[in-house]
């Protein structure tokens, strides 16, 4: 993320997610952007005490190939809703255009879209579109939940300018609301609710945040060993049956070129006897002393999925201390997954 000071005194902050392998699920991009931006903006705003000054707003914009894609659609909506304040409009709407899933191709489609907007504006008689009506429009017009990245890179930008936010901790919730408003059906129809951000801010109660994480997100981190390969080359995959992650520890320093097997060694069972006796995770990520810009390219370039903890570490170069504390507090005892069956059989034969 790189903050840029504007002449008006505002600060724009952006998080870029790069894709080198074609289309990627937009939900993945959104979740990574939320994690990164919430952490960084919270720290920056707390340091500058920005919330003691003028109120701030956020808008969510997706760029493809470095070109802003939302301005044309915002202008169309401004024409259809003359009463709508421009800042309110930009705060609530984000449009995906170009080679992506959402755009208006024909005059007929444009007329239909503007008609929907006009009906809502007349019915509400307000200066903004309420969330339910906005979602109904996007459900009809945004059919594909995948953002096709045909250019060299895509950029996710969150800007805050003029709408009030009570505290820095409210940033994550605001971002989640904006993202859910532009996704068809939000982040899913699970009764557990939508995305909740996980940050590494020291004074944030992560337990309350992480408890509400969408199960789809949690499932991505439930990994187990593949019995068809040796322990040192096991591939990570989703486990629908395992209850929680089985991570052991990290031994060495961060390196972008690192083989993932040494980054996330939860499929290694050298310390099995200790884990069997104590059922507790002793995460020992080694913190880097120098500061660096978060690098999401390590996630795109990694062929195997990572656990949530190592994913955070690879991007930010520091351990997710609060996430680890929460995990150990909640699942540290009597929740360790059993080792693969072939590993159990091997130990029996060696006795």
Curated annotation (Swiss-Prot):
Q: Which portions of the chain have biased composition (kind: Basic residues)?
A: 232-249
The membrane-spanning stretches of this chain are none
GO CC aspect terms: cytoplasm; nucleus; spindle pole
Role noted for this protein:
Part of a checkpoint which monitors spindle integrity and prevents premature exit from mitosis. This cell-cycle arrest depends upon inhibition of the G-protein TEM1 by the BFA1/BUB2 complex.
Record PTM Phosphothreonine, positions in chain: 211
Q: Where is the composition biased (Polar residues)?
A: 1-14
Report what the protein is called: Protein IBD2
Q: Which UniProt keywords apply?
A: Cell cycle, Cell division, Cytoplasm, Cytoskeleton, Mitosis, Phosphoprotein
Name the source organism: Saccharomyces cerevisiae (strain ATCC 204508 / S288c) (Baker's yeast)
What is the primary gene name for this protein? IBD2
